[in-house]
Design a protein with these regions (language model features):
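Periplasmic c-type cytochrome electron-transfer domains
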Residues: 29-583
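N-terminal secretory signal peptides that target proteins for export/translocation
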Residues: 1-9
Length: 583
């Protein structure tokens, strides 16, 4: 029951029934998650206070969706054959599947823990789950199974739910990185065409790619004097061939919070968004318009504005010393271990922080999908559904931002013909501030990440910055690149991303941001690691890029290994400001 009205009289639970002493109990009808009081109209998105939007998003995140909302599929729904195979006697009255989505009624069921702590009123060191857990991770029992081939194939992809704290920062940092990469692609393409026109022959040019100072391999293009170009991304590393940095999910398959939210609603609950299926009943449950544009905006904003993780350095001298020692080893700066560490060690990929030049989150308004019949319905059996590049919001944002930057009055250095990544990186830093993420639609919602204003407690605290327009260092502990993790961790097959034709190979995984990692066990993409030390050791297998680092870790003394773990244990998920438990 979503909410129960109780008197001030003492209540006692008896076998699941609430007995109200001294007064008669008043029955309250069960309500759906989406009511007129919380529904958001996208056409009026700029009329609502941000607090209202976020509070409604929290409702959609935590309150179980019901059949009245549109939860579940009909008897002839996309996963009907799978449900019938798994539950032959209960079908069609059993609405869940579990082995390929249809596994829950709310986001909260799989994002519900932010670790343990000692409550302030405890007299011992006994631990209790932290309050304010919305947006956290979950245990192995909440793993998601993605298997469109069930029952003909028993398992395919298994995913442990990650926490979603600070995702707005991640989206914005990745957007700036994508813009920087796309700028280099556009500049070298223009240079190749210009040279081909001068020489009257096809010209091939190459350039090393960098974003936020990090390497992304080499991009090449062959252009004719007529402007016909053939790109070569065979030597590009850490990012897909479209050069879009995707900061979300274990494989790096989603570039915006919204795209993943709309597909997760469909995959896990069969709550279909109009931006995906239009006004068509694609899941055949007799309901249309299950998730409106405004309601998806609210849920997206709620998730993206979760407060960022933080670092809790032990207050005692011994604990602080252990933390600092672990940090030095993690970053490869421990002087007494010169020659024994592998370069910058863990920080080679788990980069301590990335700069965000413009601390602004854009929640895009994609409009209603142009689906006019059942034949146009997208697949519901995939965790993420791709869009063609021309309909993909992030791709279009990057494209327009690059064009605006190159047209800016201060872009002379970028238009000088240099394809040097360092020159481009230096010039683009200030231009990112001058040319913010473009507005693709009047309904796009913009939120300042540093000072969002009046917002629910779960949003705070934010990352520090002197002003609401100043750059922010985002301590993700990630380079937001994909890496080969070897045969030991690789998936059994590819996983598609959010753009048509982009597939992530089985051994490739996104460098998982480690901020908050202490409170997100079990660890790794499928939850196989029961401890942080296990997670480190499981990075090693044939073909893994992490092998040299893991080998160096294995050679450390037990005390130094525990120091690295202590550093990771300081990366915490915070209890929201003004939320307390105990006295």
């Amino acid at each position: 029951m979503r909410r129960i009205v109780r008197s001030k009289a003492r209540c006692a639970p008896v076998f699941g029934v609430v007995v109200v002493l001294g007064v008669a109990a008043t029955a309250v009808a069960q309500q759906p998650a989406i009511t007129p009081q919380v529904a958001i109209d996208q056409a009026r998105i700029h009329d609502y206070p941000l607090r209202k939007i976020l509070e409604s998003g929290g409702d959609f995140h935590t309150t179980p969706f019901t059949p009245e909302d549109g939860h579940g599929e009909g008897q002839e729904g996309p996963r009907a054959r799978q449900r019938q195979a798994l539950y032959p006697e209960a079908f069609p009255n059993f609405p869940f599947l579990r082995v390929n989505g249809l596994d829950s009624q709310s986001c909260y069921e799989c994002h519900n823990t932010i670790g343990s702590y000692v409550p302030p009123d405890y007299s011992t060191k006994a631990l209790l789950r932290k309050p304010s857990p919305v947006g956290g991770s979950a245990g192995l029992a909440s793993n998601a199974f993605i298997n469109p081939n069930f029952p003909w194939q028993l398992t395919y992809l298994v995913r442990n739910p990650p926490h979603v704290f600070g995702t707005g920062y991640g989206q914005s940092v990745a957007g700036e990185m994508s813009t920087e990469l796309a700028l280099q692609r556009e500049i070298i393409t223009r240079a190749a065409i210009a040279q081909a026109k001068v020489e009257h022959r096809p010209v091939t040019l190459s350039t090393p790619l960098r974003a936020k100072g990090l390497p992304f391999g080499t991009y090449s293009t062959r252009c004719t004097e007529e402007g016909q170009c053939t790109p070569d991304t065979s030597k590009v590393t850490g990012v897909a061939s479209d050069l879009i940095v995707r900061p979300f999910q274990w494989k790096g398959i989603a570039s915006s919070v919204r795209h993943f939210v709309r597909d997760a609603l469909d995959f896990h609950f069969s709550m279909q968004a109009v931006e995906k299926v239009g006004h068509i009943d694609c899941d055949r449950d007799g309901k249309i318009d299950e998730m409106t544009l405004g309601n998806v905006t609210a849920l997206t904003a709620f998730v993206a504005m979760t407060r960022p993780p933080y670092v809790v350095v032990p207050p005692d001298p011994a604990g602080k010393e252990r933390f600092e020692r672990g940090k030095a080893i993690f970053e490869g700066t421990a002087k007494d271990l010169d020659g024994k560490l592998a370069g910058t060690m863990c920080a080679t990929c788990h980069v301590p922080s990335l700069p965000l030049e413009v601390p602004e989150l854009v929640v895009e308004d994609p409009g209603v999908a142009d689906v006019t019949s059942m034949d146009g319905c997208p697949s519901e059996t995939l965790l993420i559904n791709p869009e063609p590049p021309e309909h993909h919001a992030t791709t279009q944002q990057v494209k327009q931002r690059v064009a605006a930057i190159l047209a800016h009055k201060d872009a002379s250095a970028l238009n000088a013909g240099s394809v040097n990544a360092a020159d481009i990186g230096a010039a683009v830093k200030s231009l990112l501030v001058s040319v913010p993420v473009p507005t693709l639609d009047a309904g796009d919602l913009r939120i300042n990440l540093t000072h969002p204003g009046d917002a629910p407690a779960y949003v705070y605290p934010r990352l520090p910055a002197p002003t609401d327009r100043a750059p922010v260092n985002v301590p993700l502990l990630s380079d937001l690149r994909t890496h080969n993790m070897g045969s030991g961790l690789q998936d059994v097959g590819v996983q598609g991303a959010d753009v048509t034709g982009i597939d992530i190979a089985p051994p490739l995984f996104l460098t998982r941001p480690l901020w908050g990692v202490a409170d997100t066990g079990p660890w790794l993409h499928d939850g196989r690691a029961r401890t942080l030390k296990e997670a480190i050791l499981f990075h090693s297998s044939p073909g893994s890029e992490a092998n040299p680092v893991v080998d160096a870790f294995k050679q450390l003394s037990d005390a130094d290994q525990q120091a690295v773990v202590a550093f990771l244990l300081a990366q915490r998920l915070p209890i929201a400001i003004d939320i307390r438990q105990g006295k």
